[in-house]
Regions:
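Positively charged n-region of N-terminal signal peptides that target proteins for export
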Residues: 1-6
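Residues marking helix boundaries in flexible regions
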Residues: 8-10, 127
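Hydrophobic h-region of N-terminal signal peptides that target proteins for export
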Residues: 11-19
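A "functional boundary" signal
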Residues: 18-131
Length: 131
């Protein structure tokens, strides 16, 4: 029994870490939904919810939830008139989005193109829209 004690402790710790990760994902999903719901009525609130999701995954790379939150954060900042902040976050979101998630990558590039169009940099807007 004593020989199995370290194994039991390890299994308990692994189980706890899995539960914590699952809770984080569920919290992120809830906050992203709140961000989407508030986007056009209250962009400042949408920005807040999206920023909370980004904080949930501080060091992770290749995380679609974080990239999606950054996308909605950028949309909210665009609506608030903060175009530079929006573009910077969209380029950062491209780093987090998995390359196989074509829909998310397409949405990010389309929003970058729309922002460059708003800033009257039409060549850059076309370049981003073609990706």
């Amino acid at each position: 029994m004593k020989n199995n004690l370290p194994i039991y402790i390890l299994l308990c710790l692994l189980n706890l870490s899995w539960v914590h990760a699952r809770n984080r994902q569920q919290e992120a999903e809830t906050l992203i939904k709140k961000s989407v719901d508030a986007l056009y009525n209250n962009p400042k609130q949408a920005s807040y919810y999206a920023a909370k999701v980004i904080e949930l995954f501080p060091e992770e790379r290749q995380n679609d939830q974080k990239a999606e939150a950054m996308f909605y954060y950028s949309q909210a900042e665009k609506l608030l008139g903060n175009f530079d902040v929006s573009i910077k976050n969209l380029y950062d979101a491209l780093e987090y989005a998995t390359p196989t998630n074509k829909e998310l990558n397409g949405q990010i590039y389309a929003l970058i193109g729309a922002l460059y169009c708003k800033l009257t940099d039409y060549n850059k807007a076309i370049e981003m829209s073609e990706k």
